[in-house]
Structure formats: C-alpha cells, structure tokens
Amino acid sequence: MNLSAKTVVVIAIGAALYGIGGLPMFGIPVFANTTLKPAMAVLALFSVLFGPLVGFLVGFIGHWVTDLFAGWGVWLTWVLGSGIVGLIIGLFPSLTRYRLEKGDFNMKDFALFVVLALLGNVFGYGCSAFLDTILYAEPFTKVFTQLSIIAIGNTILIAIVGFFILKSVAKRNKQSRNLTEA
C-alpha cells in the first residue's frame, strides 16, 4: 500500500480531530462506558470526503488516541469497530458516483448516507460487541445494549450534523466547479 503525502496528512488530521472529539469531556454519557461523541461526525465527514481507506484509518487511529488519552486503556475491539464504521461510510463516494464532488447532494444521497451510517455502526460496533463477549467475557446483554444505543445515537448524530456539512460541501463544490468551467 502506497499512500500519498496528502493522504497521510488527511489521516493524521482526521485521527487527531476524532481522538480529541472522542474524549469524555466532549461526549454525552448514555449508558455504562457508553457516550455519544462529536467525533462520529468527524469520522463520517472524513470518510465521505476521502473514501473507505481514510475512513477506516481515521476511525481506528482516532479511537486509539481517544482511549489512550481518556485513561481507561485501549479497547482494541472498539477501536476496530470505529475503523469499520469509517470504512463503510467511506463507500458513499463510489456508491453515489462521486456526485458530491460535482456539487450534487440530493435527498436520495442523504438517505444512502444515513443507511451507510446505520450499517457501519451496527456492523462495526456489532463486531466490537461480539468480540467483547468472546475475548473479555463481557456480559452479552451489556455489550448489545451498548451496541443498540450507540448505533441509534451515532446514526442520528451523524445524520443531523452530516446533512448540514454535506449540503455545504456540495454547495462549495458546485460554486468552485462553476468558476473553473467559465
């Protein structure tokens, strides 16, 4: 795998923003060891703008940074889950034929964005929950309650924040595209 300097810088910035935005002081506690955090909007944005590989690495490295600085130790199962969330949301550009880059973002694209966010959260953190029960002998009901709350909460957060950000990105791309065509 050969990453360009631009891609490495984008991953570093995204991971740092995710890592900081994931700290407990910025989150809303909703269940045992479970918080809704603005970092998820950062992950979604970087995934949509730069694709699945960047999304995976921003989620994986960013969650690792959060866990390191939060002081509760690195939970690799949930670090992996965040990477998977970024990977799945990162499929958005190719599934929409890169319409966002062309300045187009319609309600069908928004619906796809929300579905990818939900699938990413369910599958990514579903893997985390499953691995927690096997590797760490965490109670099944606890981790799947965490999964349910996180999947719904993160999807709502990503949908609300993402709508406004992606509308703005589309508008900016459309304006800059019009300037180059003239």
Swiss-Prot record:
Spell out the GO cellular component terms annotated for this protein, sorted alphabetically and separated by semicolons.
plasma membrane
Superkingdom is Bacteria
Location of this chain's protein in the cell = Cell membrane
Q: What is its main location?
A: membrane
* InterPro entries in UniProt: ECF_substrate-spec-like (IPR009825), UPF0397 (IPR022914)
Protein's UniProt keywords contain Membrane:
yes
Q: Which residues span the membrane?
A: 8-28, 41-61, 72-92, 110-130, 146-166
Keywords from the UniProt entry: Cell membrane, Membrane, Transmembrane, Transmembrane helix
What does the record say about its membrane topology?
Answer: Multi-pass membrane protein
Q: Which family does it belong to?
A: Belongs to the UPF0397 family.
Under what name is this protein listed?
UPF0397 protein VPA1481
